[in-house]
């Protein structure tokens, strides 16, 4: 199993990054918040989880081992595969997910595209006793503020399945709320997803 990768970022997209390790470029599937912290040409380390299927080998990457552990735990619930587990971490921080499951906050879980009320209830039922300690206070978001945040958020939303038009409207709405210091990209992304969730 490939537990982590360290190397130079050679490319990024809405849902993946390419990390060059020993002359080999590894395509790593990542949540938008993780990609937002990567810079092409700069070194990076990602905790990784290798998902093996009959016809594919897919490497998923995370900012830290906490997110990776939650990704793997989510997949032990009925009906949750790697793509849905990754979508959960695209919408919420690991701390928020743990709190939502521990507190049976199905409303927070249904903000994730692909999770309905029954799916959220199933996650709570199956994982509540295994979710681990829930941190108190803060949402755990972290990121590097850049002037290019609108494009980063727009690309991330399209990568999560919304149309370019929907992404544009959400970015415009979020931009109106930004006053002074710009929050980290993952925070802005979650705000945009919440706005889009209300209009679905």
From Swiss-Prot:
Localization terms from the record:
Cytoplasm
Asked if the keyword Mitochondrion belongs to this entry, the reply reads: no
What the entry lists under SUPFAM superfamilies is as follows:
DNA helicase RuvA subunit, C-terminal domain, Nucleic acid-binding proteins, RuvA domain 2-like
What Gene Ontology molecular-function terms does this entry list? Answer: ATP binding; four-way junction DNA binding; four-way junction helicase activity
Residue segments, region Domain III: 151-200
Region (Domain I): which ranges?
A: 1-63
Q: State the function annotated in the UniProt record.
A: The RuvA-RuvB-RuvC complex processes Holliday junction (HJ) DNA during genetic recombination and DNA repair, while the RuvA-RuvB complex plays an important role in the rescue of blocked DNA replication forks via replication fork reversal (RFR). RuvA specifically binds to HJ cruciform DNA, conferring on it an open structure. The RuvB hexamer acts as an ATP-dependent pump, pulling dsDNA into and through the RuvAB complex. HJ branch migration allows RuvC to scan DNA until it finds its consensus sequence, where it cleaves and resolves the cruciform DNA.
Assembly mode: Homotetramer. Forms an RuvA(8)-RuvB(12)-Holliday junction (HJ) complex. HJ DNA is sandwiched between 2 RuvA tetramers; dsDNA enters through RuvA and exits via RuvB. An RuvB hexamer assembles on each DNA strand where it exits the tetramer. Each RuvB hexamer is contacted by two RuvA subunits (via domain III) on 2 adjacent RuvB subunits; this complex drives branch migration. In the full resolvosome a probable DNA-RuvA(4)-RuvB(12)-RuvC(2) complex forms which resolves the HJ.
Looking at the UniProt record for this protein, which Gene Ontology cellular component terms does it annotate, in alphabetical order? cytoplasm; Holliday junction helicase complex; Holliday junction resolvase complex
In this chain, the stretch annotated as Flexible linker covers 143-151
Encoding gene, per UniProt annotation:
ruvA
* Domain comment as written in the entry: Has three domains with a flexible linker between the domains II and III and assumes an 'L' shape. Domain III is highly mobile and contacts RuvB.
Q: Which family does it belong to?
A: Belongs to the RuvA family.
The UniProt keyword set, sorted, is:
Cytoplasm, DNA damage, DNA recombination, DNA repair, DNA-binding
A GO biological process this protein is involved in?
Answer: DNA repair
Which protein, by its recorded name, is this?
Answer: Holliday junction branch migration complex subunit RuvA
Where is region (Domain II) located? 64-142
């Amino acid at each position: 199993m490939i537990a982590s990768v360290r190397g130079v970022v050679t490319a990024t997209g809405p849902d993946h990054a390419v990390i060059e390790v020993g002359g080999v470029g590894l395509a790593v599937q990542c949540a938008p918040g993780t990609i937002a912290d990567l810079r092409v040409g700069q070194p990076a380390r990602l905790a990784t989880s290798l998902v093996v299927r009959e016809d594919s080998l897919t490497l998923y990457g995370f900012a830290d081992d906490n997110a990776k552990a939650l990704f793997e735990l989510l997949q032990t619930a009925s009906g949750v595969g790697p793509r849905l587990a990754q979508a959960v971490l695209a919408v919420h921080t690991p701390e928020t997910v743990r709190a939502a499951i521990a507190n049976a906050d199905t409303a927070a879980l249904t903000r994730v595209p692909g999770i309905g009320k029954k799916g959220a209830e199933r996650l709570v039922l199956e994982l509540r006793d295994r979710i681990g300690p829930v941190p108190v206070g803060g949402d755990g978001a972290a990121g590097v503020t850049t002037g290019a945040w609108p494009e980063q958020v727009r690309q991330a939303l399209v990568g999560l399945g919304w149309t370019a038009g929907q992404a544009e409207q959400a970015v415009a709405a979020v931009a109106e709320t930004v006053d002074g210091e710009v929050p980290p990209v993952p925070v802005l992304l979650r705000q945009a997803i919440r706005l889009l969730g209300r209009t679905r």
